[in-house]
Amino acid sequence: MDAKDISFIQDQIGYNFKNTDLLQQAFVRRSYSHENGGENNEVLEFIGDKVLDFIVVKLLSDKFGYTKGELDDFDSENDWDEYACDYCENKLTEIKKQLVQKQNLATCIDELGLAEYLIMGKSDQKQHADEQPSVKEDLFEAILGAVAIDSGWNLEKLQDTVELMLKPETTLEEDDEDNYVALIQEWCSKETGNIPLYHFEEGSYQATWYMPFDGISQNCNVLGSPEYNKLMASTHRCLLKIADDIPIFRGFGKSKSEARKNVCRLAYEWLDKNDRLHTIRNELENPNRNEAIGQLEILARRGYFTLPTY
């Protein structure tokens, strides 16, 4: 791994290592260490597996749980300030299972573009191990293990990294149309064949709004509005590049995950305004009435609707 590779990986996961050797170790398979000596990523994977479980449970508790004292109708004299949750244990277990299952972690690694950096021995190379979901799952967990060790088990940094790598909003958001991170991922895949490139920085909107920026930046000129107050309270910013012929976007948030969500919304709204969104018409080379039946069959095969039965 060279400095450029390390910089790219750190940008994608939103964490800068003090000890970049730990980051590289997260990518080393046992097959490589067996042939060349040194350590591999297996213990880091074990650590990361436990980190992932803990952070996902915390995310679910933060989103769906509450103490009754937070409710408007809470009566401190007659009610107990107990912990409650919108979902029962079985439902929470089901959601957690969806988030941490092998295929989901493998998909996240693909969307981050990290599998190609795996350091493998000859046996793994022959078997194309970097294409196997279980190997990508191991890599996901090993990266979290490396972050845990490097950060001194810093809970905030671990949660930031899990949120950025796992994209839990993809599973937790009820309205897919509001999941701008997933929508930008899909746009990049269809339009450029590449992944969106993120770069995270610590810094508030308040400290940077007046500085020149060669791109499209999240902004709000309505003083005192909820959106303005959120911007002023931001502590992180995220830069996003989706294509060479499209400006760089910049968003802000109280967390890296929120900044990413805001910059993706900004980018998606720009694409919509500038007629750059992929629509159903893009699926057909030459939409016309004469070939309507055949073109409807094409769209049905691509999942836009189901064919009628007669």
For the regions a language model picked out, list residue spans one by one.
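Double-stranded RNA-binding/processing signature
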Residues: M1-Y310
